[in-house]
Amino acid sequence: MLTSEQTGRNNGRLNANTHARRQGGHHERSGKEAHALDRRWRTGGINTAECLIAMEAQLNRITGMQQPLGKRFDMIGGTSTGAILAAGLCLGRSATELRDFYLSYGEEIFTKVVLPLRFWHKYSADPLTGRLKEKFGEATKLSDGTLLTNLLVVSKNATQGATWFFNNNPRGKFFANNRDLPLWQVVRSSTAAPTYFPPQKMAVPDATGRTVEYEFIDGGVSTFNNPAFQVFLEATEPSYAYGWPTGVDKLLLISLGTGYCPLSIAGGKASDYNILDWAKYTVSDRRTTRIFSKPIDVADR
């Protein structure tokens, strides 16, 4: 979650009017704000980064202190392109620097592969992989001490058919297994959108110490395209080993995204819907309703 150090309230969103502290967790700070970045590709990454730039500037103005968002929030989570932004913020990158990442390398990353390969995916993973290694550091691990705050990345384990949540909480159930996973690889796994990029292979140790290779695809291919609810659960549900207190005076969840699909249909228009229209509507409705039901395909990592 994004948790702010600030006191006072500005338009009810940027600051939490609280001095409460967590009773456990990885990074300690006063106040609680949760920040989830849902997935959008080229335009979404840039647009969400612009929202982050505005937030960063506003907080710097209010506090009179120049600080990256990674130092102002206790947890930052992201799915797909949101995972790139979340990881960058946790490493202390400025919102402007992350926006420039998309502007500088978008064309390179989204260069289409030769025709025979397009049957499987539009783009090669090599440019994106190279830039993620360059931006986050090839040797940076999920447990790296350079991460300024708690990180949550959503990915879909295609081999198991389960949604995996990668985090850097040392008290988390699967932290011992995941601590040495390269950060760039975790982020790349969350951005592996089917038909756009090939899956990301990752070798992950199991409970017996045996290493198992899995294939991961975009975390948006799950009910956690917008990870806000999972970020809230990670922070507050005791089984996730944070156990932060809830309440309007103790925690603030900020969810930044650049798209919304309304489920309402204008009067008289439903009768005009064709098969494709109803397919899209059904998928949107399923994502909306399932996020509030008990997850059956998830594995906290």
Predicted regions and their residues:
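Extended hydrophobic secondary-structure segments that form protein cores and membrane-embedded regions
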Residues: 35-39, 71-80, 150-156, 215-218, ...
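Short helix-terminating capping/connector loops at secondary-structure junctions
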Residues: 28-31, 65-71, 143-148, 209, ...
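Active-site periphery "cap/insert" segments of enzyme catalytic domains
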Residues: 126-148, 162-165
